[in-house]
From Swiss-Prot:
CDD domains: AAA, Bac_DnaA_C. Residues 73-112 are annotated as: Domain II. HAMAP family: DnaA_bact. Residues 330-453 are annotated as: Domain IV, binds dsDNA. The gene is dnaA. Keywords: ATP-binding, Cytoplasm, DNA replication, DNA-binding, Lipid-binding, Nucleotide-binding. Gene3D superfamilies: 1.10.1750.10, 1.10.8.60, 3.30.300.180, P-loop containing nucleotide triphosphate hydrolases. Oligomerizes as a right-handed, spiral filament on DNA at oriC. This is Chromosomal replication initiator protein DnaA.
């Protein structure tokens, strides 16, 4: 059959898109490109060795099947990366579905603790969570193989619980009878305490050690719980030796959990530790747009950018701000504009400790006045306003008393400082442009302070 490599690969992609789940296709297959097809060998380039290895281990049969179905005969397939790493796809073209089915036991307890919104399709992937997402999908597809245990690590509200529950949803959608246990550390401990009180430890151990998939959230709360650590150690060993998948989530790496037994640190670190960082601006905007889509809302771009710019610490705060904005505009009947939502949201300003000199210099440069003007007694409107802004920001970013702030501004009285701070605080609740300006000034002060430290 005389067809071009690109046409062949496009046909294969169309077929794979139908056969695979959307998260699986978008994570592993979608960005792969065809490099060459000659001498009955199709060369496919992928982004990195992580994807290359997973395709070889998990998707070799289904890719081989679809390539053969397009050209009409078996074809050798070689995977490569831009760095030159290569791997041949070899082995029997066993059915992808048949291969997975052999790993699952026929019965499973009911699982009623999952949030229906926490699925892979609703998880927004960005540079700061891409590895964690890919690893989570990998263990959901092929448990007990590459990353066991998988340890998700990141701050509060960054998506660890979402990914853990997405793993559980994925397995249960494919295999409703799979024994998938998703619990918090608190629940695991409470179950253990109840078993001790009821003299039913054997039942407790049997329950957790028959899992095909054990996902434990907030594992940092195991700190100081010696007996819980003891039971978890033996449960982990039993499951791991049986090839069952364990997934753990924490706000810190295993070695940073106080009083965690060394043997548990070793076990938790033997698989993959996938870190999740604060999402960047583009990812935060994408999260808001997807959230609005599920709420059947169309958000103006400037509103999305305003919320994403001002809520940077975690996803929960970000989505909470959007919900407040939607609720306010719905109840008030106002249109969704930055001017209308800014006073209601009143976004938090990160306060990095800063020196008075940094604050004075930042305000002077940004508002086009001199430091001498800020410390002087001029009552010109633009200078007086800049001075009030400077006093407000100095109160936000330092621990200085009102009299000390007054001294930094040329010996002003503490009542003048208090008046200025109150005035700016009240104005920003009504004036979205002022609120935005204060946020930008705080960001500049933060950046300058971090550079100095």
């Amino acid at each position: 059959m005389n067809i071009s490599p690109q046409y062949l690969w496009n046909q294969v992609l169309e077929r794979l898109q139908i056969r695979l789940t959307r998260p699986a296709f978008e994570t592993w297959i979608q960005d792969a490109t065809v490099q060459e097809w000659k001498d009955n060998c199709l060369v496919i380039q992928v982004a990195n060795s992580f994807i290359l290895n997973h395709l070889q281990k998990t998707y070799q049969p289904i890719i081989a099947q679809e390539v053969a179905s397009v050209v009409g005969y078996p074809v050798d397939i070689q995977l490569t990366t831009a760095e030159g790493e290569t791997m041949a796809m070899t082995g029997e073209a066993q059915s992808y579905q048949e291969k997975s089915l052999t790993q699952i036991a026929p019965e499973s307890p009911k699982l009623n603790q999952l949030n229906p919104r926490y699925t892979f399709s609703r998880f927004v992937v960005g540079p700061t969570n891409r590895m964690a997402h890919a690893a989570s999908l990998a263990v959901a597809e092929s448990p007990g193989r590459e990353f066991n245990p998988l340890f998700l690590c990141g701050g509060v509200g960054l998506g660890k619980t979402h990914l853990m529950q997405a793993i559980a949803h994925y397995r249960l959608e494919l295999y409703p009878n799979a024994k998938v246990f998703y619990v918090s550390t608190e629940q695991f401990t409470n179950d253990l305490i109840a078993a001790i009180r009821q003299d039913s430890m054997e039942r407790f151990r049997e329950h957790y050690r028959r899992a095909d998939f054990l996902l434990i959230d907030d594992i940092q709360f195991i700190e100081g719980k010696e007996y819980t650590q003891e039971e978890l150690f033996h449960t982990f060993n039993t499951l791991h030796e049986a090839g069952k998948q364990v997934v753990l989530a924490s706000d810190r790496a295993p070695k940073r959990i106080p009083t965690l037994q060394d043997r548990l640190i070793s076990r938790f670190s033997m698989g993959l530790i996938a870190d999740i960082q604060v999402p960047d601006l583009e990812t935060r905007m994408a999260i808001l747009q997807k959230k609005a889509q599920y709420e059947n809302m169309r958000l103006p771009r400037d509103v999305v950018e305003y919320i994403a710019t001002n809520y940077t610490s975690n996803i929960r705060e970000l989505e909470g701000a959007l919900i407040r904005a939607i609720a306010y505009t719905s109840i008030s009947g106002l249109s969704m504009t930055v001017q209308n939502i800014a006073p209601v949201l009143n976004p938090p300003v990160e306060q990095v400790p800063a020196s008075p000199e940094v604050i004075l210099r930042t305000v002077a440069e940004s508002l086009k006045v001199s430091i001498e003007d800020l410390k002087g007694s001029s009552r010109r409107r633009e200078i007086s306003f800049a001075r009030q802004v400077g006093m407000y920001l100095m109160r936000q970013h330092t621990e200085l008393s009102l009299p000390r702030i007054g001294e930094e501004f040329g010996g002003k009285d503490h009542t003048t400082v208090l008046y200025s701070c109150d005035k700016i605080s009240k104005l920003q609740q009504k004036d979205w442009e002022l609120s935005q300006m204060l946020s930008e000034l705080s960001d500049r002060i933060n950046m300058a302070s971090r550079t100095q430290s």
